[in-house]
Amino acid sequence: MKRKKTVIHQLISEKQRFEKAKEGGNMAAKDDFGTTKYIIHAEFEANGVVERPDVVGAIFGQTEGLLGDDLDLRELQKTGRIGRIKVEVHTKAGKTYGTILVPSSLDRVETAIIAAALETIDRVGPCEAKIRVIKIEDVRATKRKYIIERAKEILETLMEEEIPETQELVEEVRKAVREMELIEYGPEKLPAGPHVPFSDSIIVVEGRADVLNLLRHGIKNAIAVEGTSIPETIIKLSKERIVTAFTDGDRGGELILKELLQVADIDYVARAPEGKEVEELTKKEIIKALRSKVPADQLLTIVQQRKELFDKLGRERRRGGARKQEYTKKGSLNPQPQVHPNEKIVKPLKVLKPDYKEFEEFIEKVKNDSIALLIDENKNIIKEVPIRDMLSAIESSESIYAVVFNGVITQRLIDIVSEKGAKYLIGARKANVVRRPITLKIITFAE
């Protein structure tokens, strides 16, 4: 009677364990196999209907004491060397079939011994049974295979991502530096290079991108108008500095240039190549365009001459048409067409003023080299200095007859040159001059 109670109690305990394992589901199984090295895969067949607890009980019961204390399944499971045994069963035609999974963290030899011990089980519950080991799975090999496949995927993803080239990294750093160098100038906060506040000459461009492109190539005295409406800051700067208008080679650039020439005092005009914008020019194209700049006065003269030529041609055509109609009315009924020789329009030569002609050679020299020349009465060059050193050179020199330079004639310069007793002051253009000494003759390149 006591033995019967013990068996019933054991069956109840096995059933509770089965229900608990069933509730845990796959997660429990995953936890059991998480730290194992090997998994024993076996299948069984029983000549009768048995349940999972019967199979588990047979495994523990029939291997107890078979392999000694060191390989006893109960002791190994307590110490975690053997994981939870997973059994799946299904019944068909009065027989029970199923699979057994035994997780093991033992070494290969000990795991193989446990696997062989499973095949010694010949009964499950009241039924005869047979267990056959299919394979021993090396979990670490499976993990290694997973690691290799996953590493391939990660590497492929990494290689698909765009890795910036060295030049791109350098360009990113330079771009950040250029944007740091960019300043806001004037009440309108116009984008400008860092040299605009103190440079003697400035370059007026259309927009912020143009200023950044010039900064990229080392030109730091550019300022943008930011639109077709010319800011007051640009107008004010044009009266104090030597200004070069650098516009795009399209219709928009022409409109901005036209507006600049109307409201500001522009000294030189440079254009980007036809169809290109300043922001997309290379360093070579920028340098070439700036070297090819033309004086604004010369550009305006050409435009004015063309306008006068077209007006003259229009007047002659209108007069010729009127004479032809008048002759037809007053002449015979069948007037003969009058043949006129082709008339050539000859552009009158520009007559140089005596004073300008006297210094023409020196003017051409400073135009090309952007220097200042101090000349004595015999037309000998006393000093040849950069424009930035011109004032100090004048103050330290004697017997100055004329000063020729490619810059703006200011009131201060007039006063200094006059004090030195010079007779001529020749520059690119004049600023707002209030006092003009009688003994000093002031000439601009346009004159």
Swiss-Prot record:
Reaction(s) the record says it catalyses: ssDNA + n NTP = ssDNA/pppN(pN)n-1 hybrid + (n-1) diphosphate
Region span, Disordered: 316-339
One Gene Ontology biological process: DNA replication, synthesis of primer
Essential cofactor(s): Mg(2+)
Free-text cofactor note: Binds two Mg(2+) per subunit.
Domain Toprim: 200-274
Molecular function (Gene Ontology), one example: poly(A) binding
EC number(s) on file: 2.7.7.101
Superkingdom, taxonomy of origin: Archaea
Keywords annotated in UniProt: DNA replication, DNA-directed RNA polymerase, Exosome, Magnesium, Metal-binding, Nucleotidyltransferase, Primosome, Transcription, Transferase
GO cellular component, one term: DNA-directed RNA polymerase complex
List of residues binding Mg(2+) 1: 206, 248
Family the UniProt entry places it in: Belongs to the archaeal DnaG primase family.
Identification of the protein by name: DNA primase DnaG
UniProt gene name: dnaG
